[in-house]
Amino acid sequence: MKKIKRALISVSNKNNLKKLLLTLSKLKIELVSSGGTFKKIKKLKFKCTEVSKYTGSPEILDGRVKTLHPKIHGGILSKRNRKSHQKDLLKNNFPEIDLVVVNFYPFEKTLTSTNNHSKIIENIDIGGPAMVRAASKNYNDVTVIIDPYQYDDLIKELKVNNGKTTKNFRTKMSEEAFSEVAYYD
């Protein structure tokens, strides 16, 4: 187990976010976030780096492209025990991302609540599922959280393990995340 140093948070459902942020802050975990989540974190008075500042690339296409960046996905997908991956990260100045907290745009809810085709289309999440897939694929090194109901389990796991997560916990969260992505798609 390795201590979580950096978390990427991008959530449409902001319920219980403050509770999670309190724990992450106490553990001195660096926060990276985008869009509305970044604004919410700042409003709650937590220190956070905006994704565009973190990557050095602005959000583009009216916010359609925020987290689809090699610095994000390299930091999530890198195998911590593979020297070539560590060399690539170092060469490109891509820090590891150890925790990914993402839930998706409410596509299904939007689909059932409006006939506005443009609104429906804009609620199809691209970056969120990509980050969740990446974190789930790399469950040996990265913890993925997809729903606020999992925050209490994560908080407990981090407290019991001094800011770390066990492989069993990461595996369980990864399985739930893959199921959510499959359902969302």
Feature locations, PLM:
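Short glycine/serine/threonine-rich phosphate/pyrophosphate-binding segments
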Residues: 16-17, 84, 129
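Glycine-rich nucleotide/cofactor/substrate-binding loop typically near the N-terminus or early
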Residues: 36-107
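Short, basic, glycine/proline-bearing loop/turn elements
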Residues: 3-7, 70-77, 116-117
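N-terminal glycine-/serine-/threonine-rich phosphate-binding loop
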Residues: 1-32, 36-54
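Short, flexible, solvent-exposed loop/turn segments with mixed acidic/basic and small polar residues
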Residues: 18-21, 62-68, 131-134
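Internal alpha/beta core interface subdomains
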Residues: 2-5, 94-185
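General beta-strand structural signal in soluble alpha/beta enzymes
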Residues: 9-10, 30-35, 49-53, 78, ...
